[in-house]
From Swiss-Prot:
Catalytic reaction equation(s): ATP + H2O + a folded polypeptide = ADP + phosphate + an unfolded polypeptide
Organism per entry: Xylella fastidiosa (strain 9a5c)
PROSITE patterns assigned: CHAPERONINS_CPN60
Subunit structure: Forms a cylinder of 14 subunits composed of two heptameric rings stacked back-to-back. Interacts with the co-chaperonin GroES.
Enzyme type, top EC level: isomerase
Feature: compositional bias, Gly residues: 535-547
Single annotated GO MF: ATP-dependent protein folding chaperone
Annotated family: Belongs to the chaperonin (HSP60) family.
Protein name per UniProt: Chaperonin GroEL
Region (Disordered) residue spans: 524-547
PANTHER family membership: 60 KDA HEAT SHOCK PROTEIN, MITOCHONDRIAL
Length: 547
């Protein structure tokens, strides 16, 4: 086992804070409408230019192991916020940096780190409650477009196209993003269905860059039981292979010998195939398989209706124009099912919605209607160069996720204003002792940081703008894009409540851990072996010769 280097207390925290500052300073340059770009070097291909906080954070790895620990923990804040809310990574990073920096200063001054953490947690819980009070539901297309525009770094064309996509497929509909072939953004709405199950084995992946499985004009086999033996599949595999078509298998489980055989055949190129676990459980799984059968014009192979897998033929299989399978989701696009049958199925489910008394069942039935009737909207991102395309696509991804978050939990005034209003509402909060109260004050000061950073990136004096915003009420704030003050909601500057809430909670979580850190352990650097002296030149007695 390699030797370890251990550092304690103030030395440990200062090294960690230095790492946090290095990462946060690179990320926070991107915050706000006048945030700057960051250029990321790639070992292959051209550099990437981005204003996406999480993309910057993911690239940073520091040489000093102790500083790197701090940077990696801060990176976790950005990643967690991105995974949960889809946006707010830079806000979370700015909040975490402010909490960690002030918290570690207080610990160095002799305060109890555990009480500081309790104070911060108390302030965050109160602030989140206040944010929920300020939050307004997102109902109209205009609000959706505004949220998407802000998240896409004030790009109105992206905001409008996302609002249009949501209008066409519904708020529960599926929206995917692809690279376009023109300079303009385009929107295509394709009939389709998505469910939350991915490929059974990564060996099915045929698009290495995106790490997904893409099948064009595939047959679709639907089965309600486990498939373990390859013997059951031979008839279907032979028939599909003869037609040189891909095959998607959706079953309760594909395992053992059957899965191994499919993987081998796929790798050898004998048949392009992908196996996926059927969504849902029990009766709901059967119902969803029936939905897929109606959508693709196939039949569910089930012993209950007298069909066995060994006797299945291509006439029992469904068909679709395209199937896309990722690690977590499967999307069936443009199934060849009969429109009358699909409409009949939708009516049947809507009748069940009216009759059910369970909220959970109603929600699941509504999801099924959305998947059957809503279709899939495809946003094709247009750009002049590949570098611009990648940057723009990342912004569209962010905007879409932020919009979904807004639909889920509502919106609050943007530009850091909601946090300032939350500070005002909880400014009299007190802890159980002096150190806890100081922890609360640290959290309240940290909540000013996003507004300060937005203003600083716009080239203005943060303290002056902050004081003016504090003097105002409700939605009054500062529009950094135009340099004007006004009602943030009327100006269309909105943030999803879920994004700000997640950013604050994740920042406080990591900050609490760092403030209470007392020791750090890392592998000790290896000492370089002394190099042996170089051999003498020439043979003895030949010193006078010139070579």
């Amino acid at each position: 086992m390699a030797a370890k280097e251990i550092i304690f207390s103030e030395k440990a925290r200062s090294r960690m804070v230095h790492g946090v500052n290095l990462l946060a300073n690179a990320v926070k340059a991107t915050l706000g409408p006048k945030g700057r770009h960051v250029v990321l070097d790639k070992s292959f291909g051209s550099p990437i230019i981005t204003k996406d906080g999480v993309s910057v954070a993911k690239e940073i790895e520091l040489a000093d192991k102790f500083e790197n620990m701090g940077a990696q923990m801060l990176k976790e804040v950005a990643s967690k916020t991105n995974d949960h809310a889809g946006d707010g990574t830079t806000t979370a990073t700015v909040l975490a940096q402010a909490l960690i920096r002030e918290g570690c200063k207080a610990v160095a001054a002799g305060m109890n780190p555990m009480d500081l953490k309790r104070g911060i947690d108390k302030a965050v819980i109160a602030a989140v409650t206040e944010l929920k009070k300020i939050s307004k539901p997102t109902s109209d297309d205009k609000a959706i477009a505004q949220v998407a525009t802000i998240s896409a770094n004030s790009d109105e064309s992206i905001g409008n196209i996302i609002a249009e996509a949501m209008k066409k497929v519904g708020k529960e509909g599926v929206i995917t993003i692809e690279e376009g072939t023109t300079l303009e953004n385009e929107l295509d709405v394709v009939e389709g269905m998505q469910f939350d199950r991915g490929y059974s084995s990564p060996y099915f992946i045929n698009n290495q860059q995106s790490q997904i499985v893409e099948l064009d004009n595939p047959y679709i086999l639907l089965h309600d039981k486990k498939i373990s033996s390859v013997r059951d599949l031979l008839t279907v595999l032979d028939a599909v292979a003869k037609e040189s078509k891909p095959l998607l298998i959706v079953a309760e489980e594909v395992e053992g010998e059957a899965l191994a055989t499919l993987v081998v055949n796929n790798i050898r190129g004998i048949i392009k195939v992908c196996a996926v676990k059927a969504p849902g459980f029990g009766d709901r799984r059967k119902a969803m398989l029936e939905d897929m059968a109606v959508l693709t014009g196939g039949t569910v192979i089930s012993e209950e209706v007298g069909l066995s897998l060994e006797k299945a033929t291509t006439s029992h299989l469904g068909k679709a124009k395209k199937v896309r399978v990722s690690k977590e989701n499967t999307t069936i696009i443009d199934g060849i099912g009969d429109n009358d049958a699909i409409n009949g199925r939708v009516k049947q489910i809507k009748t069940q919605i009216e009759e059910t008394t369970s909220d959970y069942d109603r929600e699941k039935l509504q999801e099924r209607v959305a998947k059957l009737a809503g279709g899939v909207a495809v946003i094709k991102v247009g750009a002049a160069t590949e570098v611009e395309m990648k940057e723009k696509k990342a912004r569209v991804d962010d905007a879409l996720l932020a919009t979904r978050a807004a639909v889920e939990e509502g919106v609050i005034p943007g530009g850091g204003v909601a946090l300032i209003r939350a500070i005002t509402a909880i400014s009299n909060l007190k802890g159980a002792n002096e150190d806890q109260t100081h922890g609360i004050q640290i959290a309240l000061r940290a909540m000013e940081a996003p507004l300060r950073e937005i203003v600083a990136n716009a080239g203005e004096e943060p303290s002056v703008i902050l004081n003016k915003v504090k003097e105002g009420k409700d939605n009054f704030g500062y529009n950094a894009a135009t340099g004007e003050f006004g009602d943030m909601v009327n100006l269309g500057i909105l943030d999803p409540t879920k994004v700000t809430r997640s950013a604050l909670q994740n920042a406080a979580s990591i900050a609490g851990l760092m403030i209470t850190t007392e020791a750090m352990v890392a592998e000790a650097p290896k000492k370089d072996e002394p190099t042996p002296p170089a051999a003498g030149g020439g043979m003895g007695g030949m010193g006078g010769m010139d070579f």
